[in-house]
Amino acid sequence: MDDLRVIVGAATDAGAVREQNEDALYVADPMVDPVPDNGLLLALADGMGGYQRGEVASQLAIETLREVYYAEPVGPTDIPQRLKRAFRTANERIFAGGSAAGEENMMGTTLVAAAIRGVDLTVANLGDSRSYLVPAKRAT
């Protein structure tokens, strides 16, 4: 079997409507992350602009995802459940943070993540942010 080669690029933009960029990105560095055997974790959270603190929600989602995913080693069949637990924990923390600050400070975000371990890819998604798998021969 050929080795898997992953090339990652990441960028965000506030767009034409918003003044503030409410996106948060995470691209794991397997050489630095606490459990490198868990593979490569990639994530994007897009804070919801209709709320006051979308940028806080997106950053909290990314931080929680990283914390929960790398909390301990995972086996290849454990990755979907680990991502599910990370998403649920992020949701609970975001809801609690918004609720504690009062209704005028509610916050929300989308979250999409990909975990690559060996030649296996697991994608998790919450909200309307999308992920695309682009084969090397089709990338332009």
Regions from the language model: what does each represent?
Residues M1-T140:
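PP2C/PPM-type serine/threonine phosphatase catalytic domain
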